[in-house]
Regions:
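Glycine-biased, low-complexity coil/linker segments
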Residues: 13-14, 30-31
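S-adenosylmethionine-dependent methyltransferases
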Residues: 2-9, 20-22, 34-270
Length: 270
């Protein structure tokens, strides 16, 4: 069931969307292509046994990204055993799989494209879907967006995005919710690296298509995931993004930025 939403956003004292319930994150059994879909989620929020801010500060380093050096993030590195923790160890400390601790290739490519083409977001209301570390949301704010709402189902990402936003001198609002299917008052929707699961992609494609048909710009960064609907989108740019072999099957991923068109002819149409 999707979380309720009211528009405009009711902001909390820190600028976050305070009325939305928290929803737990998917499991991270291995590499990015193996991440399961939102359909597998339990209905209750895992009990947070560890203070998120203290944990993030103790288990990450502040790094500039190789493909987006303008932005610094709190990220896991080989110096921290966050790379090595099993699912059981993460559960023991009350930590959902830490997608927010890594700069995925799709997000890096999309962030690069936004910074290189600020006219796409300048003065506009932006939603960064499945925000993770907040990389793409931060890039949109740096490029001049009027406002950015970062959305993710993992409650830990709220703290990660706040810390990363502060590092970069921008303010990003946050909502912990599954918003797939919602129609919101946003001009631009951004999504980095979201087509890793078939069931998830099957939910996203009609939603993204409907948003584009209503006039929103829908941009996706994808490093060649198995369920990316390439035949349904327009290619905008391609990058060679440095990544870590611990997460991917190579040290560089060819990453493409795509846009869902407002209208895409069906097979046999004129």
């Amino acid at each position: 069931m999707m979380a309720p939403y009211t528009d405009p956003l009711p902001a909390g004292g820190d600028g976050t969307a305070s009325s939305l319930p928290l929803v737990p994150s998917p499991r991270l059994p291995g590499r990015a292509d193996e991440r399961p879909s939102l359909d597998d989620q339990p209905e209750t929020v895992p009990f947070v046994k560890t203070d998120p801010e203290a944990f993030i500060r103790a288990n990450t380093d502040v790094m500039s990204l190789p493909h987006v050096p303008e932005i610094r993030l709190h990220l896991a590195s080989e110096a921290h055993d966050l790379w090595l923790k099993t699912e059981e160890e993460l559960e023991e400390i009350g930590l959902p799989p830490p997608f927010w601790a890594f700069a995925w290739a799709g997000g890096q490519g999309l962030a690069r494209h936004i910074l290189d083409h600020p006219e796409l977001v300048k003065g506009k209301r932006v939603i960064d879907f499945a925000s993770g570390s907040g990389l793409v949301a931060i890039a949109a704010m740096k490029a001049g967006a009027a406002s950015v709402l970062a959305v993710d189902i993992d409650p830990w990402t709220q703290t990660a995005i706040r810390l990363n936003s502060e590092l970069n001198g921008v303010t990003v609002a946050f909502a912990a919710a599954d918003i797939i299917g919602d129609a919101r008052s946003a001009d631009v929707y951004l999504a980095g690296d979201v087509f890793y699961d078939k069931a998830f992609a099957d939910r996203l494609v009609p939603w993204f298509t409907a948003l584009a048909e209503r006039g929103a710009a829908v941009l996706v960064g994808d490093p060649g995931r198995a369920y990316c609907p390439r035949d349904r989108m327009q290619m905008l740019s391609t990058y060679q993004v440095p990544v870590t072999r611990a997460l991917e099957d190579s040290e560089v991923k060819k990453t493409t930025v795509w846009r869902f068109p407002a209208y895409f002819p069906q097979s046999g149409s004129i």
